[in-house]
Amino acid sequence: MPITPIWPAGSAVNDNGEITFHGRTAESLLDEFGSPLYVIDTDEVRARASKFVTSASNAFNNTVTHVSFAGKALLSKEICRIVTEAGMLIDTCTMGEMRIALAAGVPGRRLVLHGNNKSDEEIALSIEQGFAKIVVDEPNEPARIADIAKRLGKRARVMLRVTSGIHAGGHEFVSTAHEDQKFGVALLPVDADASKLSVLDDLTDVTPAGSNARLGEQSGEAGSDRALRYDIKYPYDMSHEKVSEGDRKLAEAMTMVADGPALAVLKDIQRHQDVLELVGVHSHIGSNIHDADAFIQAAKRMMLLRKTFYATDAYTLPEVDLGGGYSVAYTDGEDSMDIDVELGRLADAVTTVNRALGMPAPVISFEPGRWAVAPTGVTLYRVGTVKPVRLNGDATDKAGNPVHERVYVSVDGGMSDNIRPALYGSDYTARLANRKGSDDTKLCRVVGMHCESGDIVVNEVRLPADITRGDILAVPVTGAYGRTMASNYNQALIPAVVGIGETDAHVMIRRQSIDDLLSWDVSR
């Protein structure tokens, strides 16, 4: 059993109060691999990747599901092999990510290329390697991809990223489906009345899905009748006396989508169909989202786009990718997404709206990153300066209680190995890892070694009152966006990543050295 639910499954506390990972103490790991140190429980990476693949398949048990691992969360050759063996594809968005995945032996057909500013070289490599999908992110990109594909004498598989207008995510920087940001092509015209899309909620209410309903299957007279009426050719003749008010509202919504930028780009892709194969549409609404509500709203809009494109162009988009953003808990008691429950809710909603629209089942795809790897990682630090600071009467803790003293515990890492607290205000916790410690505790703030007052590792945590220089602190849930967002700020060296399982502990990504820093500086 892990220490608490937020710690890796292979972690424990021994009789001496030491944190262990598959039997190895934190002290022994730092002695062998150095400090700071990223520790990744590779057995749990495998288990969580398999779990998501299985949960998606079980939830959408009447259609095909694809799951891609978002490589931006944590990428190495070993991680690539683990997640692909678990049944995942891999999302990449730079030449570096592409090359690491290919070097790991991942075939192109298991890779996806994202990015809002892809280079010609990245596009060419993805086409040459036969990537499963290139995700188009802006209106001029289809022509660029088509030109490169034509030059290479190949046909590229492409998907359009659509900004649905659904806002989700815990921070503005990770909310990615509103219109005023850099990703994707808008679903609706800029002056459109998005409230007209509320008709999609009425559709769900009209034909509720049973737990065993098939995507695209009509259920009863209401579903069949609606599906038949909406096979009228665009731009819909709504003059028929049997057309209901609900039908008129749906026609208005479809007309609005038909006039939108996303559908225009889909049409443009089809104009290049000799070298571009249009495989679907993509939606990513944000990050660290706790339930399926926003995913359901975005999915409904993607299904409406799919129906509208069928009506205008007689083309059924084969796949709808609903992106990533599935949350994990970073501190004990924090909310996290129950994948089985929330994917089940999402499946029911997608089933229902497709039945109401009379559309066949698309392939449903997902892109988890954080969910698969964040809880598998722990960062180990050596404690340096321990500084009690007296505070005035206005200071409070996060619960609002008065605080008269805070202990600043400095460690040998910081924002160079985990930028998330500084960038997003992300909350973490920490635990003394090398001994039991005193029963008395003090209110502490764990801070890094960098020349920034915002260099905070853990904003608030109670640690043993006898914490001292040389102790080891362990910070859990650092498996995602720690190493991949690390920097050399203050010329700090990026720590090693060590993979650990039941059988061994080994270096996955080596620690940087001073020789590395000096070798990169080629000036005279």
Predicted features along the sequence, with ranges:
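A charged N-terminal "starter" segment
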Residues: 1-157, 192-248, 271-273, 277, ...
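Active-site loop/helix belt of alpha/beta enzymes
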Residues: 2-3, 165-390, 463, 490
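General structural feature for long, well-ordered alpha-helical segments within catalytic domains
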Residues: 25, 41-44, 48, 52, ...
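Conserved, mostly hydrophobic/aromatic
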Residues: 45, 72, 94, 126, ...
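Active-site-proximal loop/turn and secondary-structure-junction residues that shape catalytic pockets
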Residues: 73-75, 96, 117-119, 138-140, ...
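The start of beta-strands in P-loop NTPase/AAA+ ATPase cores
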Residues: 89, 132, 156, 279, ...
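Hydrophobic residues within beta-strands of alpha/beta enzymes
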Residues: 90-91, 111, 134, 281, ...
